[in-house]
Amino acid sequence: MPLVAPSLLASDFLHLADVCKMVNESEADWFHLDVMDGRFVPNISFGIPVIEWIRKAAKKICDVHLMIEEPEKLTPAFKKAGADTLIVHFETCRNLHSNIQQIRALGMKPAVAINPHTPVEMLQDILPDLHHVLIMTVNPGFGGQSFIPHSLEKVREMKKMIAQTGKEILIEVDGGISLENAPALVEAGADILVAGTTIFHDKDPRQVIHLLKNSKPESWRKAFLHIRDFMRWLFF
């Protein structure tokens, strides 16, 4: 059963207290918080003051995703703001190993994100030092984009690389995650589903979280359909 991390960037910030309450009371596992600087990605989102406020309201893990240049300069500030896990981008770090050591030394769980064009092999050397890996399944910076199908193969490749380390390293996916593609992602090896638009643009976000949480691998679904069809043939 995957972990579900609602991305608050897609939520209604006018009612952020209600959003936090809903996530707390739902089957969601983490809060996913996207920080954008307008340089590494085109958009600017929110920063440390908003994370501090969310941290006060959140009763679950705060997974902070830094889409910013020179993340090492602000790492201590994000720890102080309340980040439990801190994700930096491979593409922005000049000294990735040092960044990871810094995050861990401050008491946070380190993670690295890779953009759609970045091969998973680029993380081979740093992989044993990570708590999880974030595979971007859209180009970062904007919500509501369409899922990139090739991402499934990247998840499979990352799963194989992790198995070779002998460590328990989680795979997180973010971008265009929906009820339709979640089962295939889980089957490929995804452990954490980040979803924003899919959850917060629905009339019943709690139900969407429930359905994502209960995403079954595609092979399970096909087996169920075969059994169902056989039972119908047998008894009707």
Language-model features, listed with the residues they occupy:
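Short, acidic/turn-prone active-site loops that include or flank metal/cofactor-
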Residues: E91-C93, N115-T118, V138-G141, T197-F200
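Short helix-capping segments at alpha-helix termini
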Residues: E27, A57-K60, A105-G107, I162-E168, ...
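Conserved N-terminal beta1-alpha1 strand-loop-helix module at the mouth
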Residues: M1-I87, T92-N95, Q102, P110, ...
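Targeting/processing segments of secretory and organellar proteins
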Residues: E218, K222-W233
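Conserved beta-strand segments that form the floor/walls of ligand-binding pockets within enzyme
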Residues: L3, A113, L134-T137, E172, ...
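Active-site/ligand-binding-proximal alpha/beta "capping" segment
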Residues: N139, S146-I192
